[in-house]
């Protein structure tokens, strides 16, 4: 059987046509790719050949579609692209210009700049700021900060060339030095200080609660209160309770959402090695207090460890920085500018070192001594920390028929009797006065609310350790008695008896001058003889 020559020829032609078609398709693809690459290269060449664009700061827009900008420190009036929504631009916003100096694109706000401090808020869009070397300038507020509540002392970033403020930096020197809060301490949380609390409430709360009566009697509220006494007896707690109580009195006077402010000034951190910085910080603190008080809110400015800042001038006990710090505080308290709704509370255990000009009437009018707690006050303080909701040991509960409240009350009485017993076990120091008289001081003479809290905490820790060792849960009276003894022993070496007179001032044992102190607590121990520490008559200069 033979093949048809015509059929064979057609098949060869078809194969050749298919091959040519494939070549044409590959060639078309190559040409298309080359064309696209040429277009892309041309685009890149065009981009590279473009003149440089310029960035400027938007100032204002006009009805005819033109805008005012600031470019490189020059104010210019230029056109804007029709595709750009000019009405949405904000003052201080960054914009992009083409080679014809036409605004073609909107950007954001500058995030960098020089750091300045607000000295005065002039109006809705301008502030007076202080920069380097105390240079003052008036700058405009950009749209990013125009609606923010600015206050004196705030740190801002500013572009000096355009004169715009772009950002409020969360770094205020005042906020570093004060704690602006409303404490949650109530008068009911403080034990053993009923008389002192009543005195400070009369001095602070009455003028705020009944201002009409004070005006009727021509009586001005006190400007300040000094709380003084030994350490750990509740001075700071009382100041916090005053602020919390004033906060609770605001709402009944019809100020919705209002509160009081407690500015807890960290005294030693105010001190600065640069001349005038401490005084500036004090001015900023009182400016913040006046700002809050101008809204009708009571403000408590609390200076803890007041003697660290406001020592008696001219004593030579320090570098004499107080010669300018003390007058600054005096000017703030009773200067030309009135200080309304602001109460200054100072706390100190060395009130003898505070400048007398601060303590005179008209400045710190009310002076309240916070005494060490007596036996009755100690029971009240124990009741704040040793409460019936704590786990009590079953053996102690069984003695009182399972009555939880009676058991806790009995435990408190037992530990207070042990703490305030005037027996040989509780003897602490023997002091000799300048007249030659001697007196035995007991541990009760150095008790404080802080020490009572520590005794209860020790007992709780011992109860936890006993539970882990024996499986018996709860606090026992033995835990409290042991904690009391351990607290006494731990405080044996703590009093600084090198200078008896200074020690007496800190410990609250004022009166006749003490010339000699002898520790007798070690008589109860097994090692050594009683420790005797004599007064150092001349300390000289120590390196």
UniProtKB/Swiss-Prot annotation:
Residue segments, region Docks into pockets in the proteasome alpha-ring: 542-543
Keyword terms: ATP-binding, Chaperone, Coiled coil, Nucleotide-binding, Proteasome
Residues binding ATP: 232-237
Transmembrane parts of this sequence: none
GO molecular function: ATP binding; ATP hydrolysis activity
GO biological process, one term: proteasomal protein catabolic process
Coiled coil segments of this chain: 13-50
Pathway recorded for this protein: Protein degradation; proteasomal Pup-dependent pathway
Cellular-component GO terms for this entry: proteasome complex
Domain notes: Consists of three main regions, an N-terminal coiled-coil domain that binds to protein Pup and functions as a docking station, an interdomain involved in ARC hexamerization, and a C-terminal ATPase domain of the AAA type.
The protein's assembly and partners: Homohexamer. Assembles into a hexameric ring structure that caps the 20S proteasome core. Strongly interacts with the prokaryotic ubiquitin-like protein Pup through a hydrophobic interface; the interacting region of ARC lies in its N-terminal coiled-coil domain. There is one Pup binding site per ARC hexamer ring. Upon ATP-binding, the C-terminus of ARC interacts with the alpha-rings of the proteasome core, possibly by binding to the intersubunit pockets.
NCBIfam families linked: pup_AAA (TIGR03689)
Function, as annotated: ATPase which is responsible for recognizing, binding, unfolding and translocation of pupylated proteins into the bacterial 20S proteasome core particle. May be essential for opening the gate of the 20S proteasome via an interaction with its C-terminus, thereby allowing substrate entry and access to the site of proteolysis. Thus, the C-termini of the proteasomal ATPase may function like a 'key in a lock' to induce gate opening and therefore regulate proteolysis.
Family according to the record: Belongs to the AAA ATPase family.
Protein's name according to its UniProt entry: Proteasome-associated ATPase
Gene: arc
């Amino acid at each position: 059987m033979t093949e048809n020559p015509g059929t064979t020829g057609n098949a060869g032609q078809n194969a050749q046509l298919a091959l040519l078609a494939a070549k044409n398709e590959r060639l078309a693809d190559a040409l298309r790719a080359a064309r696209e690459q040429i277009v892309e290269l041309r685009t890149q060449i065009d981009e590279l050949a473009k003149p440089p664009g310029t960035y400027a700061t938007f100032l204002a827009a006009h009805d005819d579609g033109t805008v005012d900008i600031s470019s490189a420190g020059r104010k210019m009036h230029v056109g804007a692209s029709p595709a750009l929504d000019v009405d949405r631009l904000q003052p201080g916003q960054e914009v992009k210009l083409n080679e014809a100096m036409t605004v073609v694109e909107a950007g954001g706000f500058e995030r960098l700049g020089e750091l300045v401090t607000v000295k005065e808020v002039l109006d809705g869009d301008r502030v007076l700021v202080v920069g380097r070397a105390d240079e003052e300038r008036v700058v405009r507020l950009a749209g990013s900060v125009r609606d923010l509540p600015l206050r004196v002392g705030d740190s801002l970033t500013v572009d000096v060339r355009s004169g715009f403020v772009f950002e409020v930096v969360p770094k205020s020197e005042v906020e570093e030095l004060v704690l602006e809060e409303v404490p949650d301490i109530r008068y009911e949380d403080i034990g053993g200080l009923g008389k002192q609390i009543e005195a400070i409430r009369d001095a602070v709360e009455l003028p705020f609660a009944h201002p009409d009566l004070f005006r009727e009697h021509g009586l001005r509220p006190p400007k300040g209160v000094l709380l003084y006494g030994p350490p750990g007896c509740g001075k700071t707690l009382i100041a916090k309770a005053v602020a919390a109580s004033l906060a609770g009195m605001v709402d009944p006077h019809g100020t919705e959402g209002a509160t009081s402010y407690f500015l807890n000034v960290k005294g030693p951190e105010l001190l600065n090695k640069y001349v005038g910085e401490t005084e500036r910080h004090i001015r900023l603190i009182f400016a913040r207090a006046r700002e809050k008080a101008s809204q009708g809110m009571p403000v408590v400015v609390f200076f803890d460890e007041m003697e660290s800042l406001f020592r008696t001038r001219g004593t030579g006990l320090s570098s004499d920085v107080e010669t300018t710090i003390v007058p600054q505080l005096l000017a703030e308290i009773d200067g030309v500018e009135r200080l309304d709704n602001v109460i200054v509370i100072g706390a100190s255990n060395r009130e003898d070192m505070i400048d007398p000009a601060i303590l005179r009437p008209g400045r710190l009018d009310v002076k309240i001594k916070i005494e060490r707690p007596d036996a009755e006050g100690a029971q009240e303080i124990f009741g704040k920390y040793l409460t019936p909701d704590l786990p009590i040991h079953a053996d102690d509960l069984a003695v009182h028929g399972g009555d939880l409240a009676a058991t806790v009350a009995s435990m408190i009485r037992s530990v207070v009797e042990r703490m305030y017993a005037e027996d040989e076990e509780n003897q602490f120091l023997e002091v000799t006065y300048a007249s030659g008289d001697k007196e035995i001081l007991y541990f009760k003479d150095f008790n404080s609310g802080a020490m009572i809290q520590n005794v209860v905490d020790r007992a709780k820790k011992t109860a936890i350790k006993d539970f882990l060792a024996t499986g018996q849960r709860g606090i026992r009276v033995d835990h409290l008695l042991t904690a009391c003894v351990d607290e006494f022993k731990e405080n044996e070496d703590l009093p600084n008896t090198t200078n008896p007179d200074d020690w007496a001032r800190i410990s609250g044992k004022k009166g006749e001058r003490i010339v000699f102190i002898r520790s007798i607590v070690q008589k109860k121990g097994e090692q050594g003889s009683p420790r005797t520490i004599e007064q150092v008559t001349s300390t000289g200069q120590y390196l």
